[in-house]
Amino acid sequence: ADDKNPLEECFREDDYEEFLEIAKNGLEGWYANLGPMRYPVKPSEEGKHDDIFAYEKFDEIVGGMDKKFWEDDGIHGGKETFCYSPMIQKPYQFQHFSEALTAPVGR
């Protein structure tokens, strides 16, 4: 059984385009697919915990990734829709998360 997490694979392979595709095609809580996984990260500030709980932190990380926002476009009867900027520019947050995921774990 292939139990690989597609989003996790995107981070491991540093594939931002695929990440956006998954995001766009799974609007029903797509980021919840990450589940309760722990990612080792290098501490960015002294004293900070050196790993994060992905499910809790994912919103925060994704928030700065792409121009993701809700809009009332008037066409879908005010239904919330995801909008993405057309420019695929791999942001720092994704790069950092991807690097952190593949970094050797050590204390």
UniProtKB/Swiss-Prot annotation:
Cofactor(s) recorded in Swiss-Prot or TrEMBL: FAD
The catalytic activity, as recorded, is: an L-alpha-amino acid + O2 + H2O = a 2-oxocarboxylate + H2O2 + NH4(+); L-leucine + O2 + H2O = 4-methyl-2-oxopentanoate + H2O2 + NH4(+); L-phenylalanine + O2 + H2O = 3-phenylpyruvate + H2O2 + NH4(+); L-tryptophan + O2 + H2O = indole-3-pyruvate + H2O2 + NH4(+)
Compartment list: Secreted
Q: What is its main location?
A: secreted
Q: What is its EC number?
A: 1.4.3.2
Task: Identify the domain of life.
Answer: Eukaryota
Which residues hold FAD?
Answer: 35-38
What keywords does the record list, in alphabetical order? Answer: Antibiotic, Antimicrobial, Apoptosis, Cytolysis, Disulfide bond, FAD, Flavoprotein, Glycoprotein, Hemolysis, Hemostasis impairing toxin, Oxidoreductase, Platelet aggregation inhibiting toxin, Secreted, Toxin
Molecular function (GO) terms listed? L-phenylalaine oxidase activity; toxin activity
Summarize what the entry records about the temperature dependence of activity: Thermostable between 4 and 25 degrees Celsius. At -20 degrees Celsius, the remaining activity is 20%. Heating at 70 degrees Celsius inactivates the enzyme in 15 minutes.
Tell me a GO biological process for this protein: defense response to bacterium
What processing steps or modifications follow its translation? N-glycosylated.
Where in the body, by tissue, does this protein show up?
Answer: Expressed by the venom gland.
The entry's cellular-component GO terms read: extracellular region
Q: Where does substrate bind?
A: 38, 49
Gene3D superfamilies per UniProt = 3.90.660.10
Q: What does this protein do?
A: Catalyzes an oxidative deamination of predominantly hydrophobic and aromatic L-amino acids, thus producing hydrogen peroxide that may contribute to the diverse toxic effects of this enzyme. Shows high activity on L-Met, moderate activity on L-Trp, L-Leu, L-His, L-Phe, L-Arg, L-Ile, low activity on L-Val, L-Glu, L-Lys, L-Gln, L-Asn, L-Tyr, L-Ala, and no activity on L-Asp, L-Ser, L-Pro, L-Gly, L-Thr and L-Cys. Shows antimicrobial activity inhibiting the growth of both Gram-negative and Gram-positive bacteria. Also inhibits platelet aggregation induced by ADP or collagen.
Q: Which family does it belong to?
A: Belongs to the flavin monoamine oxidase family. FIG1 subfamily.
Subunit-level organization: Homodimer; non-covalently linked.
What's the name of the protein? L-amino-acid oxidase
